[in-house]
């Protein structure tokens, strides 16, 4: 069964792999935005050789990704070596943006969820995979999304970056589709969540597991890394 990231909010607690309850932190309102008014965090520079990804997560699931006092997101950072930050969103947004910044060089082998296969990967690839795996764990409890279903992942990118993914006449994206076996769509502007910038477009990759291959082939065919920027 296909699931999306647009499920209605739920009030149940999130359970970790140990079976212990991991309630959504009280510091976050039901839409995932902070209850307390506070200045926005300073921008994060993207060092040379690093790549930045902005992942979309429904607000009803973001508490389970963050964890109580940030314990889960801190563990994800420790495990992958990535910088991970949940960005503030307008109160009208049903989604939050998870910013992932990590080295783009391939330097490790990782196991893919639901498979005994190990693949070579960069810290960026591993971090994106692990964040989405956590989102799916939360979704299974909060929204009853069954394991093994076809689930898509959605990322935000600036229009100029999306142009590099598509290529002239759609040649690049078609080659990535053939090589990875994934379905890739650039969604129309009216489907953008309010947490997106006016210069953003949304890329959907399905099934989510192919995000690993998609990132690899994206680098290979476009040579495009999102460097020296502030987020």
Name every feature range the model reports, one short phrase each.
Residues 67-70, 167-170, 207:
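Periodic glycine anchor positions in long extracellular repeat architectures
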Residues 1-64, 72-157, 188-231:
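Low-complexity, intrinsically disordered regulatory regions of RNA-binding proteins
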Residues 154, 161-179, 183-187:
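Alpha-helical bundle protein-protein interaction modules that mediate dimerization/oligomerization
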């Amino acid at each position: 069964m296909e699931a999306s990231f647009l499920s209605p909010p739920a009030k149940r607690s999130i359970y970790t792999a140990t079976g212990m309850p991991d309630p959504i932190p009280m510091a976050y309102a039901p839409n995932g935005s902070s209850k307390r008014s506070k200045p926005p965090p300073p921008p994060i520079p993207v060092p040379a050789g690093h790549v930045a990804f902005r992942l979309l997560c429904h607000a009803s699931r973001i508490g389970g990704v963050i964890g109580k006092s940030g314990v889960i997101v801190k563990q994800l950072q420790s495990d992958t070596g990535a910088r991970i930050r949940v960005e503030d969103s307008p109160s009208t947004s049903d989604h939050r943006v998870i910013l992932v910044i990590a080295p783009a060089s391939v330097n490790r082998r990782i196991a893919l969820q639901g498979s005994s296969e190990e693949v070579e990967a960069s810290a960026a690839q591993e971090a994106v995979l692990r964040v989405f795996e956590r989102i799916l764990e939360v979704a299974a409890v909060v929204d009853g999304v069954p394991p093994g279903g076809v689930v898509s992942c959605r990322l935000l990118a600036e229009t100029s970056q999306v142009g590099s993914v598509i290529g002239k006449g759609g040649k690049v994206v078609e080659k990535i589709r053939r090589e990875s076996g994934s379905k890739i769509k650039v969604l129309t502007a009216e489907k953008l969540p309010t947490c997106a910038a006016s210069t953003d477009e949304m890329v959907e990759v399905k099934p989510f597991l192919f995000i690993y291959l998609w990132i690899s082939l994206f680098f290979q065919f476009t040579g495009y890394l999102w460097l020296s920027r502030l987020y």
